[in-house]
Amino acid sequence: MKVWVDADACPGVIKEILFRVADRAKVEVTLVANHWMRIPPSPFINLKTVSSGFDVADDEIVKLLSAGDLVITADIPLASEVIDKGGVALNPRGELYTEQNIKSILNMRDFMDTMRASGVQTGGPAAIGASEKQAFGNQLDRFITKHHKPS
């Protein structure tokens, strides 16, 4: 089991949680981004840079992930592709995307896109607060405890 991170849009506080968990649980965490970013020295933390372009990092994650891998992303279409390939997707606010909820979440995203395209101001998400950080950490810990078997 590996953890893949859609790193370009992933908040720094979430990356820090992932870095700590990678070393503590000895789980491989790979950040995929279209630009270089600083990562701590660790045998469990990797950075894969891809070329710039629409969905290039997303496509790379889908190409590399295996069934049972965890992907950290707020990108709902990417989460849907991950689930279709047998992976698990978790957003930075601690919401687990599943086969049971991804279709309704995708429909809501598409509806909001339509609203924005028609000129309705929908606003963006609020900054990640303490409760979201805790929810993310809890979901991550539960997933790793259940699915990761250190070698």
From Swiss-Prot:
Please give the CDD domains that the UniProt record associates with this protein: PIN_YqxD-like
Q: Which InterPro entries match?
A: UPF0178
| A Pfam family reported for this protein in Swiss-Prot or TrEMBL | DUF188
Disulfide bond entries: none
Write down the PANTHER family for this protein, in alphabetical order.
UPF0178 PROTEIN YAII
Record-stated family: Belongs to the UPF0178 family.
Q: What is this protein called?
A: UPF0178 protein Shal_3046
